[in-house]
Amino acid sequence: MNINLTLFGQTLAFAIFVWFCMKLVWPPITAAMAARQKKIAEGLDAAGRAQQDLKLAQDKVSHTLRETKEQAAQIIEQANKHANAIIEEAKQQARVEGERLVAGARAEIEQEVNRARDQLRSQVAALAVAGAEKILESQVDAKVHNELVEKLASQL
């Protein structure tokens, strides 16, 4: 066999093989590569969007958390103010109640003192009558004597 003819035949066979591959094998491979390339590009775009969404969500969460902490601090501050107001009101009520009890006790003490004074006056009057009876050795009218003692006690 002639080497030129063999080379020519192999070149022709190779050309037919290349044409066959270009017509039947190459289009599905390029289509699959294009589809895969498109899918990878979409995946990268989705990953980029997901990162942006994640960053936005993290910013939103941190903003919401900050607002929530501020609201909690305000609520705690209001609760403390309210508690202090209740404590002050209770103290004021306790002061008023204490003053009322002290005033009542003072009034009661004053009544007892007046009652004791009246009892002492009547006892002094009785002693004065008894002393006067002994001095005069006669009985003095108790009504007249009580009037004299009342005048004397009112002057004291």
Swiss-Prot record:
It is a single-pass membrane protein. The chain crosses the membrane at residues 12-32. Belongs to the ATPase B chain family. F(1)F(0) ATP synthase produces ATP from ADP in the presence of a proton or sodium gradient. F-type ATPases consist of two structural domains, F(1) containing the extramembraneous catalytic core and F(0) containing the membrane proton channel, linked together by a central stalk and a peripheral stalk. During catalysis, ATP synthesis in the catalytic domain of F(1) is coupled via a rotary mechanism of the central stalk subunits to proton translocation. It comes from the Bacteria. The keyword Ion transport applies. CDD domains: ATP-synt_Fo_b. Pfam families: ATP-synt_B. Keywords: ATP synthesis, Cell inner membrane, Cell membrane, CF(0), Hydrogen ion transport, Ion transport, Membrane, Transmembrane, Transmembrane helix, Transport. F-type ATPases have 2 components, F(1) - the catalytic core - and F(0) - the membrane proton channel. F(1) has five subunits: alpha(3), beta(3), gamma(1), delta(1), epsilon(1). F(0) has three main subunits: a(1), b(2) and c(10-14). The alpha and beta chains form an alternating ring which encloses part of the gamma chain. F(1) is attached to F(0) by a central stalk formed by the gamma and epsilon chains, while a peripheral stalk is formed by the delta and b chains. GO terms for molecular function: proton-transporting ATP synthase activity, rotational mechanism; proton-transporting ATPase activity, rotational mechanism. NCBIfam families: ATP_synt_b, PRK05759.1-2. GO terms for cellular component: plasma membrane; proton-transporting ATP synthase complex. This is ATP synthase subunit b. Its main location: membrane. The keyword Transmembrane helix applies. It is found in: Cell inner membrane.
